[in-house]
Regions:
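Histidine-acidic metal/acid-base catalytic patches
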Residues: 1-149
Length: 149
């Protein structure tokens, strides 16, 4: 993500930005929320591909969003909200064994539930202070209080 942001700086055009793929961030060993924060803070987040995977280098599992890393998915969605992302969300999953319509419906429900949970976290008011203090237990207890989907 850092190298892609440098490219955005070099191109220096208002219509040149990035699409983040959660699964690709995971496979590259990145925290997807950190990547979203880096790109969002610079106003260069133009698209988001939502999926999940087991983070093996070179693998693109394309699993349902939040199915393997639910807390990372919640953190990612909360970061999108923090930076007022209002662009497109794409589900980049590969339903090889599943009914594709059923998987798509699940992805929509899961994304909506995570979005609502992130809104509750942000509305509670202490999320930014807890993360600034690096209070992991405080964040986990906050998630517990507002309800993890």
């Amino acid at each position: 993500t850092g190298a892609a942001l440098l490219l955005c700086d070099d191109v220096d055009r208002p219509n040149f930005g990035l699409t983040l793929d959660v699964g690709h961030c995971l496979a590259a060993g990145e925290n997807p929320a950190q990547s979203a924060a880096m790109v969002g803070a610079r106003g260069k987040l133009f698209g988001v591909q939502l999926n999940d995977g087991y983070t093996r280098l070179g693998a693109e599992d394309g699993l349902a969003f939040g199915s393997v890393h639910p807390l990372l998915a919640l953190e990612f969605v909360a970061t999108l909200q923090k930076y007022n992302y209002d662009g497109h969300l794409y589900f980049d999953t590969f339903p090889r064994n599943e009914d594709p319509v059923r998987e798509c419906e699940y992805n929509i429900r899961r994304c909506e539930a995570l979005w609502a949970a992130a809104e509750r976290l942000r509305a509670e008011g202490s999320l930014d202070a807890l993360t600034a203090r690096q209070d992991a237990m405080g964040v986990l207890e906050l998630i517990e209080r507002v309800g993890m989907p």
